[in-house]
A protein has these predicted regions:
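Loop-to-helix "switch" segment enriched in basic
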Residues: 127, 171, 181-182, 186-191, ...
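Conserved P-loop NTPase "ATPase switch" module shared by AAA+ and STAND
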Residues: 123-148
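Conserved NTP-binding/hydrolysis module of P-loop NTPases
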Residues: 87-108, 122-125
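Conserved adenine-nucleotide phosphate-binding loops and their immediately adjacent elements
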Residues: 2-42, 108, 203
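A short hydrophobic beta-strand->loop->alpha-helix junction that borders the nucleotide-binding pocket
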Residues: 54, 76-85, 109-113, 191-192
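Conserved AAA+ ATPase core "coupling" helix
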Residues: 195-206
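P-loop NTPase Walker A phosphate-binding motif
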Residues: 48-79, 91, 95
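Sensor-1/coupling segment of RecA-like P-loop NTPase cores
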Residues: 49-50, 143-145, 152-183, 187-190
């Protein structure tokens, strides 16, 4: 099929069965508040590992994406989900690398029976031959990860020394920390690091023309204790309704306060 005028030609072939967007650095959401002051938590030399652990809504992916976008030519990004098999992950893994190194691992399609650990070993050896350092990010959206512990340890053991490994996850698997530490420096970034500061609350309020110096509004926002997703939705509601929300009451009355708040925000979009 001919390309229309102005349409960009693909610079590489997409690996069969791969959803390309899951091998690309995510775009930042609208009204994203830059968190460059947290980049120091991520900036580690190779070989090293940085683990970001926090519940959903703490801006883990957005923070790493903002940091990665500034150096995209050396970032290998992979998003994995609950339904991914080891074969699916292998294909995503190779495609993510081909995004920055076109033609990488030509053997992958020619030898379909190669085991995942062997794929990672070959991948690491080929990356070493480039003579460059890379950042490898895995955004792990899987919730039942206990089954991944053994394979994760075996895969990490194959990572080459020219890789800074960054893993984003919702739960902690301390049993892998020893393996991660064996690669070099290990840093763990948690909820206390990712929570919005008071100055960030003020900046978000200013972006949405909300008077942060209003006592009730300020109390409403501070009740979220820096939880980025909750703060963002509170901001939206306050900007829409021109009045504060009793978030503490919402927490006390709901088993899933963030879901309840999200539902409330969605309802206002139809008004």
């Amino acid at each position: 099929m001919a390309k229309s005028k102005g349409e960009k030609q693909a610079e590489f072939e997409v690996t069969s069965g791969v959803t390309l967007s899951r091998t690309l650095i995510p775009t930042l959401p609208p009204y994203y508040l830059s968190r460059k002051h947290l980049f120091s938590l991520l900036e580690q030399p190779s070989p090293s590992t940085t683990v970001l652990i926090a519940p959903a809504g703490y801006g883990k992916t957005s923070l790493v994406a903002e940091w990665a976008l500034a150096q995209r030519d050396r970032v290998i990004w992979l998003t994995i989900t609950e339904s991914d098999s080891l074969q699916d992950m292998s294909a995503l893994f190779i495609q993510a690398t081909r995004n920055i190194i076109p033609g990488f691992a030509p053997w992958f399609e020619k030898e379909p029976g190669v085991r995942p650990v062997e794929i990672v070993r070959r991948w690491g050896n080929e990356l070493l031959t480039t003579g460059k350092d890379y950042i490898f990010v895995i955004d792990n959206l899987r919730e039942h990860t206990s089954r991944d512990v053994d394979i994760a340890s075996r895969l990490v053991e194959q990572f080459p020394p020219n890789i800074q490994f960054v893993t984003i996850r919702r739960d902690s698997i301390e049993t892998v920390y020893a393996t991660l530490s064996s690669r070099g420096q290990l840093a763990v970034v948690g909820t206390s690091d990712l929570a919005f500061s008071e100055s960030e609350l003020a900046a978000l309020a200013a972006m949405h023309k909300i008077p942060f110096d209003d006592y009730e509004i300020r109390q409403s926002l501070e009740a979220a204790h820096g939880w980025p997703a909750a703060v963002s939705m509170l901001i939206h509601q306050i900007a829409k309704n021109k009045k504060p929300i009793d978030f503490e009451k919402l927490i006390a009355s709901q088993t899933e306060p963030l879901r309840a708040l999200a539902t409330s925000v969605i309802d206002t979009l139809d008004d």
